[in-house]
Amino acid sequence: MILDVDYITEEGKPVIRLFKKENGKFKIEHDRTFRPYIYALLRDDSKIEEVKKITGERHGKIVRIVDVEKVEKKFLGKPITVWKLYLEHPQDVPTIREKVREHPAVVDIFEYDIPFAKRYLIDKGLIPMEGEEELKILAFDIETLYHEGEEFGKGPIIMISYADENEAKVITWKNIDLPYVEVVSSEREMIKRFLRIIREKDPDIIVTYNGDSFDFPYLAKRAEKLGIKLTIGRDGSEPKMQRIGDMTAVEVKGRIHFDLYHVITRTINLPTYTLEAVYEAIFGKPKEKVYADEIAKAWESGENLERVAKYSMEDAKATYELGKEFLPMEIQLSRLVGQPLWDVSRSSTGNLVEWFLLRKAYERNEVAPNKPSEEEYQRRLRESYTGGFVKEPEKGLWENIVYLDFRALYPSIIITHNVSPDTLNLEGCKNYDIAPQVGHKFCKDIPGFIPSLLGHLLEERQKIKTKMKETQDPIEKILLDYRQKAIKLLANSFYGYYGYAKARWYCKECAESVTAWGRKYIELVWKELEEKFGFKVLYIDTDGLYATIPGGESEEIKKKALEFVKYINSKLPGLLELEYEGFYKRGFFVTKKRYAVIDEEGKVITRGLEIVRRDWSEIAKETQARVLETILKHGDVEEAVRIVKEVIQKLANYEIPPEKLAIYEQITRPLHEYKAIGPHVAVAKKLAAKGVKIKPGMVIGYIVLRGDGPISNRAILAEEYDPKKHKYDAEYYIENQVLPAVLRILEGFGYRKEDLRYQKTRQVGLTSWLNIKKS
């Protein structure tokens, strides 16, 4: 199994290193035969001798083209003759490539920016992470002593915790009497002990949570200050900091540094990405948070250190558990795109598609298009096109709703209509499909590069799903599931890749044709469903729709929906297929992207309504949840309105307990960097003035008091609120918390703010908003 690949330099020549695990043992293989190269397209092949003479200079050394080779390739499907220009060292490429490009005989150069080690994997057909090796995983986390305003790395590391499949432990340098705590004499000894543990346990994968930005850089700073070499690489090297776009990434040679933060922010959508929030979202279990000021206070006073140690140990344990949860999918993506796990776990979906295409282009003898220049990139950013169709919802409360959607709409369109840069407006084509509204033509005489690859991916996914049904082995079933999910993620990213401004195979015409066909097919479904089957379509968004038959019985609606699916699929071309996705007992649609439905088991699905961020008070969240439940479970909008009025009345009468009023916001930067002073910053500054250490990442809970002046001046720490001394600002909580939360729902039924605040009789047709068609 290939874990990673890089190259070193020996006597001026590059040497590829493959970091591998075979039969349970780690080894490094070397290849001294692979040479860097670029492609050049010449106006006149007889000028190659002139091109061969082009030289450059690097570190005082003359850089030359050491060999050339004429090769027959394809470019966007068309035959092309190019020259392969070999160089001595990968670092010679940036030195000489522009001189080659500017030569009068050269039309253009290609594939000059593919990193050498990645090029090796592609050309040799090697796939990282393939094989059945058992990988050793170790997670770690650090706790530091931080005081407000201190520069990064100034305060000591006070604890290093680590976890693997056998244990979770903490190393520290103050006496803490707990079975999982190891006490050493100093910070220096703690770091050295941690290095020994890494060497003893010899993990293949080191898991961190934000280790690229925090744990590793902090560890490196402290180690440098204390005169320690962080030799944790399997070749005896120290961690290497690299720039990837706007971020720093840390590489450990021979061990895969798997930073969960990048993977999780790409994979799941959460209001906040603290370790605690992520752990609770994934496992459904809360994890205690101990804040920086509490850690500092405990360390400096020597009190409550057991709590800090437990928190540190649980951090490492949580990181390990999350690693086990997310690694299998990333390993499958690594295999799928053929690049190392370290890179894949830090890649956007656009980059994953690109690495997949680069490998497939090489296999099909295609020269890859170049990345855009800065000027071209800016031009692409300015381009726009019409997206998917969204129908304004039919407002009110509806019953017996079916949800129908297209199976992989955009990938199916790309394959069915052969939408690809190499088939676009192809001269001499006899058969082509014309995109509706936009008019772009796609040739059907030859299979397009991207549609054919996408077709193979979807075929493979279908085979895997069949195999999943057949296999009796639960482990195999889990692994197959990760594989099909990886394929789905990649396949669904191709449409977005066409419009990705940095893409090599960028194609705005392709992207806008895909959405145009998408609009055509969903509108066809809408028309046929209403005109021929008597449904009323309530809401459409891109590839799916909600519909009902007003006054219809639930079983009749389900039956007719299934009949319609069979009917429409016989009319749809190619791979396009509509599916019956679900039945909902009740639902309402407020505006585009904002709706809620409840299924027959009582499961509520909402979009665009829920207030999950922590800067909403508990009273706002609780009231919204009660309103949702009353409408969806009981079908009673008027009761929901009564609940809101009751809560508003209780707020006005100061009957709401303070714990339901606290608003929580995170401090995201040092206090002196804030220009706009929000309530949480104002409270944090008051705490800092009292000597409390405020650190980025801390969450401040505050309550807004009654009075004059800006809200920031009237916010106090939630824990300091005393009902005997303080009065909360009822008007603030009514206007800025409860009403905005419930109006997200109730405005869909024609209610306005003033209808909820005051006991007025509604004169105008409430029933016209409800539209309840009882079955």
Swiss-Prot record:
EC number(s) per entry: 2.7.7.7
Reported regulation of activity: An 11-mer corresponding to the PIP-box of RfcL inhibits DNA synthesis.
Protein name: DNA polymerase
Any one biological process term the GO annotation gives: DNA-templated DNA replication
Subunit composition and interactions: Monomer.
UniProt-recorded Gene Ontology molecular function terms: DNA binding; DNA-directed DNA polymerase activity; endonuclease activity; nucleotide binding
Family statement: Belongs to the DNA polymerase type-B family.
Uses, biotech or industry: Because Pfu DNA polymerase exhibits the lowest error rate of any thermostable DNA polymerase studied, it is routinely used for PCR. It is sold by a number of companies including Promega, Stratagene and ThermoScientific. Various mutations to improve its abilities have been incorporated.
The keyword Transferase is assigned to this record: yes
Keywords: DNA replication, DNA-binding, DNA-directed DNA polymerase, Endonuclease, Hydrolase, Nuclease, Nucleotidyltransferase, Transferase
Reaction(s) this enzyme catalyzes, per UniProt: DNA(n) + a 2'-deoxyribonucleoside 5'-triphosphate = DNA(n+1) + diphosphate
Free-text function comment from the UniProt entry: In addition to polymerase activity, this DNA polymerase exhibits 3' to 5' exonuclease activity.
NCBIfam families the UniProt entry points to: pol2 (TIGR00592)
Gene3D superfamilies: DNA polymerase family B, C-terminal domain, DNA Polymerase, chain B, domain 1, Helix hairpin bin, Palm domain of DNA polymerase, Ribonuclease H-like superfamily/Ribonuclease H
Keyword hit for DNA-binding: yes
